[in-house]
Design a protein with these regions (language model features):
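A generic structural signal for well-ordered alpha-helical segments enriched in polar/charged residues
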Residues: 40, 71, 75, 125-129, ...
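Conserved ATP-dependent motor core of P-loop NTPases, especially the RecA-like helicase ATPase domain
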Residues: 56, 77-78, 83-90, 95, ...
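Accessory N-terminal region flanking or inserted into the helicase ATPase core
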Residues: 1-23, 28, 32-33, 51-53, ...
Length: 219
C-alpha cells in the first residue's frame, strides 16, 4: 500500500537548500519521510550515492532505513550499490570512513577494533609497561587490587581521555602528579595501539575527527 506525503512531509522531502531541523514524535512518519527524502535526492536531484549520509543510534534502525530505501528505489526500477552510501550508527559510519581513508591515518591494513573485554585484556597484558610509568595503586590510593582490576581502572581512564579529546602531551607535562601519570599512560597507550594496529571503541570517532582536521582531502 503506497502512502502519499502530507504537505509538511513534502516540504521536508523537497528541501535541499541548507540544513533542515525536524522535530517529530513517535508514529509521525519520520522514517517514511527520511526514505522519501533520500529517494528524492538520488532520483530527482541526481545526488551520487556516495554523498548520502544517514546516521542512526542503532544498527536495527540503520538496517530498516537501508531496506526501505532499497525497496523504494526498486519500485522505480533503480538499483544502487549500498556499499557506496554511509548508512549506519555513528561508530559504524566512522569506521567506514577510516577504512576508506586508511592511508591518511595511523592505521594499517586489517586493523582490529577491540571491544570492552579485548581492551581490558590488552591493559592486563601490558600492565607491567604501564606500571613502569606510574603505579595504579598510587593513582587510586589503594594497593589491594587484583591485576585485572588495575587493568580495568587504566582502561576506564584511557577511554575518558579519548572521548574528551584530551591533549595527552599537555597532560603529561602537568604539574599535578596524577594528571601527569594519566597523560603518560595515554601516550604509551597510543604508542602500543599503533604498534599492534589496534583501535578501541572510544577512539573511533576521535580518529575520524582527527582525519578530517588534518586531511581536508579525505572523505
Amino acid at each position: 500500500m503506497a502512502f502519499s506525503p502530507t504537505p509538511q512531509q513534502r516540504a521536508i522531502i523537497e528541501h535541499t537548500e541548507g540544513p533542515v531541523l525536524v522535530i517529530a514524535g513517535p508514529g509521525s512518519g519520520k522514517t517514511f519521510t527520511l526514505v522519501q527524502r533520500i529517494t528524492h535526492l538520488i532520483v530527482d536531484k541526481s545526488v551520487p550515492t556516495e554523498q548520502i549520509f544517514v546516521a542512526t543510534f542503532t544498527e536495527k534502525a540503520a538496517n530498516e532505513i537501508e531496506d526501505r530505501i532499497a525497496r523504494e528505489l526498486l519500485s522505480r526500477n533503480i538499483v544502487v550499490n549500498f556499499d557506496d552510501m554511509y548508512i549506519g550508527t555513528f561508530h559504524s559510519i566512522c569506521l567506514k570512513i577510516l577504512e576508506d581513508n586508511r592511508d591518511f591515518t595511523r592505521l594499517k591494513k586489517n586493523f582490529t577494533v577491540m571491544d570492552q573485554f579485548d581492551q581490558t585484556y590488552f591493559f592486563f597484558q601490558h600492565l607491567a609497561e604501564f606500571e613502569k610509568v606510574g603505579q595504579v595503586a598510587d593513582f587510586v590510593g589503594s594497593d589491594k587490587m587484583s591485576r585485572w582490576l588495575k587493568a580495568s581502572t587504566i582502561c576506564d581512564w584511557m577511554n575518558k581521555l579519548s572521548e574528551e579529546l584530551v591533549n595527552s602531551e599537555k597532560l603529561a607535562s602537568d604539574s599535578h602528579p596524577k594528571l601527569q601519570m594519566l597523560g603518560k599512560w595515554h601516550l604509551l597507550y597510543q604508542q602500543l595501539l599503533e604498534q599492534e594496529n589496534l583501535l578501541d571503541f572510544s577512539m573511533i570517532q576521535a580518529e575520524t575527527l582527527r582525519l578530517f582536521k588534518n586531511h581536508e582531502e579525505a572523505g
